Amino acid sequence: MSHNTFGHLFRVTTWGESHGPALGCVVDGCPPGLRFTLADIQTWLDKRKPGQSRFVTQRREDDLVKVLSGVMLDDDGETMISTGTPISMLIENTDQRSKDYSEIAKRYRPGHADYTYDVKYGIRDYRGGGRSSARETAARVAAGAIARQVVPGLVVRGALVQIGKHRIDRANWDWAEVGKNPFFSPDPAVVPVWEEYLDGIRKAGSSIGAIVEVIAEGVPAGIGAPIYGKLDQDIAANLMSINAVKGVEIGNGFAAAEISGEDNADEMRVGAGGDAVFLSNNAGGILGGISTGQPVVARFAIKPTSSILSERRSIDSDGKEVDVRTKGRHDPCVGIRAVPIGEAMLACAIADHYLRDRGQTGRLK
């Protein structure tokens, strides 16, 4: 299987499977001299790890990261300094239950990658989905923690803005609320609504989709490239690569089709310091594939997980018609834990384009 690497200068390769002994990543192209601690990486993994509420899978994984290469310890014994060589990180799997999947060893779960993996490779790891499992994304979050260190002043944040048909009220948006509830919701008023709704989904053994919004602030103007090297193109590709993502939009996205050119175009003025000031941000911080200096805003839609308790019609690898009912531990809404994953993938795209711009123009330090 190829295509386990993304990025151009800031390159990330992930490896490992859901029920293997470990998973991890190799980050290549990281500039030398970056200073960070293990806690700077672990903080983001702790946001993503399973088993933290009744609304996510009850698989218990500590997701403790080990940095194996690419750094030297400073004199304080805690701060790591990147050397410019590949940074390799490892996360052990400790709570696999492969026996939960024995009944689907030959059966294809509807909506899952079982059938397509078998068609393409002639073999598949049915234990938790193997490489197609969202367990792989823990490594991406670790890589994203490194990416955040590459761009000076970069702040990447995310929030869950919709579960099923239940949306947040954007008038209530408060970043301080995101870490106070199990949904990463910026709207405290919607939390009890989501709790009741997801309890019903969870008890029925079903699942539901969601929408995540990720925002990057501190992105310098001018990174990205026209035509085939667009910043938003690579952001979309990074977000689409996340398990279960079925749609991505930048800025106004699909809503731009409903408004006029007067309403959509971001007007400009000269600020007090002589810099360009935008009066709105419908473009999501990107014009012509190049950043404007405004916050970069993206949203992505996540389908309901295909692992549900209801019996579904399918076939097996012998070509027989079967009914499939998935056992095991699964997220009733995978969109919840996709928030830190989306943040990581956005950070990686921006770090990559930042380094590409620095190499091409020399204007960024």
From Swiss-Prot:
Alphabetical keyword list: Amino-acid biosynthesis, Aromatic amino acid biosynthesis, FAD, Flavoprotein, FMN, Lyase, NADP
Reactions listed under catalytic activity: 5-O-(1-carboxyvinyl)-3-phosphoshikimate = chorismate + phosphate
InterPro entries in UniProt: Chorismate_synth (IPR000453), Chorismate_synth_AroC_sf (IPR035904), Chorismate_synthase_CS (IPR020541)
CDD domains: Chorismate_synthase (cd07304)
Binding site for FMN: 131-133, 243-244, 288, 303-307, 329
Claim: Cytoplasm is one of the keywords in the record: no
Annotated cofactor note: Reduced FMN (FMNH(2)).
Record GO terms (molecular function): chorismate synthase activity; FMN binding
GO (cellular component) term, any one: cytosol
Signal peptide residue numbers: none
Enzyme Commission (EC) number: 4.2.3.5
GO biological process: amino acid biosynthetic process; aromatic amino acid family biosynthetic process; chorismate biosynthetic process
PROSITE patterns in UniProt: CHORISMATE_SYNTHASE_1, CHORISMATE_SYNTHASE_2, CHORISMATE_SYNTHASE_3
Binding site for NADP(+): 48, 54
Keyword Flavoprotein found: yes
Pathway: Metabolic intermediate biosynthesis; chorismate biosynthesis; chorismate from D-erythrose 4-phosphate and phosphoenolpyruvate: step 7/7
Cofactor(s) the protein requires to work: FMNH2
Subunit structure: Homotetramer.
NCBIfam families in UniProt: aroC, PRK05382.1
Similarity annotation: Belongs to the chorismate synthase family.
Function: This reaction introduces a second double bond into the aromatic ring system.
PANTHER family the record matches: CHORISMATE SYNTHASE
Protein name (record): Chorismate synthase
Record organism: Sinorhizobium medicae (strain WSM419)
